[in-house]
Amino acid sequence: PTIRYGFSNTHLNAWADIRLRTRDNRSDRKMKRETWTFSGGKRVTQFNKENPIDHLRNSLTTLFYGENFMKTYENYFGSISFTKRFESGLRIGLSALYEDRIPLYNTTDYTFSNKNKVRITTNFPVLGESDTVFFSRHQAVLVSFDVSFKPGQKYIQLPFSKIPLGSKYPTFSFNYTKGISDILGSDVNFDKWRIGISDDKNLKLAGTFKYRINVGGFINAHKVAIQDYQHFKGNQSHLAAGDYLSSFQLLKYYKYSNTNDFYVYGNID
């Protein structure tokens, strides 16, 4: 469980996760696994669910430079997810999420230097160079399907488990998310998809070569809230983002967030 209290806005947020795991004891205890996750409560969430900036970094950039990059909203939520992993290298996942989304507003413009107060921005994402996207309270019901597969997976067989040795082939992934309207008051209606390929090559004395390429888009964008846009993991802080393979070090956090029919992006390390 997690408990969060805002001393300025006096909001109490509390939420918890329950995970249930099962294994195939007949053959091995690790490679074949099912996981059920139940979550619910009231929380504060970044608009980009990949959490491009952490709380400590955002606090430091705000206090020292007046740059409050983290943009968040409050939500009552409930979710259920199921994942199953097979020893063949196949992994599937299903999830359903309900959110009652509530705007959060700044309650202070405090910085260590008064001259930096003018840099403080609203707690809403800025698309492009200056297009601030506001939203009003609404509800959303989302269902998602994920599948990933790494062909040619090899293992070492032990008496009660298997140890994966990897594969010479990349990992392929697919995600489909549907925003369903008129269920539990849901106000969203969209369909989006993403296909990805990634790999980590050991070049021995030359080091390692990692890459990740994704293509996707919106098949239906009839009613898309800013929380459900396609976001990219940018970085505007004065320090490098931790995961080079899934982030863009010089990209503004929400500059290219979109509901386009098609997009493609990639990372190489």
What feature does the model see in each segment?
Residues 3, 16-22, 40, 80-84, ...:
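Residues on the lipid-exposed face of transmembrane beta-strands in outer-membrane beta-barrel proteins
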Residues 6-10, 23, 41-47, 83, ...:
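Structural signature of outer-membrane beta-barrel domains
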Residues 11-30:
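Strand-loop-strand
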Residues 17-21, 111-114, 184, 228-231:
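Charged/polar, low-hydrophobicity segments characteristic of intrinsically disordered regions
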Residues 29-32, 165:
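Short helix-terminating capping/connector loops at secondary-structure junctions
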Residues 35-56, 60-73, 133, 164, ...:
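C-terminal outer-membrane beta-barrel translocator/porin domains of Gram-negative envelope proteins
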Residues 50-203:
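Transmembrane beta-strand segments of outer-membrane beta-barrel domains in Gram-negative
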